[in-house]
A protein has these predicted regions:
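Juxtamembrane/disordered regions of integral membrane proteins
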Residues: 1-186
Length: 186
């Protein structure tokens, strides 16, 4: 068994590597994720309608109904006419990129801690690189790539965008696995 204390360096470095890789994918390679989102052609009108409804931060569904209303002809009409979707609203104000980046780095650390915890229980010191790589890579891939797939299934995120997120997750998993394999205790 390998302890978390023995894996502090791969935990930290893999988090840093993933953080920088994600920065490249999202901020430098503008062709990769920039086309994933688009605005409304009548953004001012949509924004005014949302403000008029006094909607605070949260998740909103359109059309919204309770389960017992699903069979109601008026509700079914709303679904047929559209739009049908989910809208996420944040608090009004300037985007705080620093807070988002801090939360993302904390998530990267958390993933690496769980990868270390799992691999530390199933692998011994001196385990060959490829065995560490496979174990940690599988765990990291499940964390970074698979957790977001239900967004496309249930919330309508475009599959093209979702596949890109899975590819991102694969890159992050490979970086995490490589770091752990490289720095695995003898």
């Amino acid at each position: 068994m390998v302890t978390l204390a023995q894996l502090w360096l791969p935990i930290l470095l893999s988090s840093v590597f993933v953080f920088f890789a994600s920065s490249i994918l999202h901020m430098v390679l503008k062709f990769w994720h920039m086309p994933d989102g688009s605005g409304f052609s009548n953004e001012d009108e949509v924004g005014a309608a949302i403000r008029k409804g006094s909607s605070g931060a949260g998740m909103y569904m359109i059309p919204y109904c309770k389960p017992e209303q699903m069979k109601d002809p008026a509700t079914q009409d709303k679904f047929r006419q559209g739009p049908v979707g989910v809208i996420f609203l944040r608090q009004p104000g300037a985007m705080n990129l620093g807070a988002f980046l801090g939360q993302w780095f904390a998530f990267c650390l958390l993933v690496s801690v769980f990868c270390a915890h799992l691999s530390g229980h199933v692998l011994a010191g001196g385990t060959p690189y490829m065995r560490v790589f496979g174990t940690v890579g599988t765990a990291a891939f499940m964390c970074y790539a698979l957790g977001s797939v239900p967004n496309a299934i249930w919330w309508g995120h475009p599959w093209k965008s979702q596949i890109k997120h899975v590819i991102d997750g694969l890159i992050y998993a490979l970086l995490t696995a490589g770091t752990f394999g490289w720095l695995w205790p003898a």
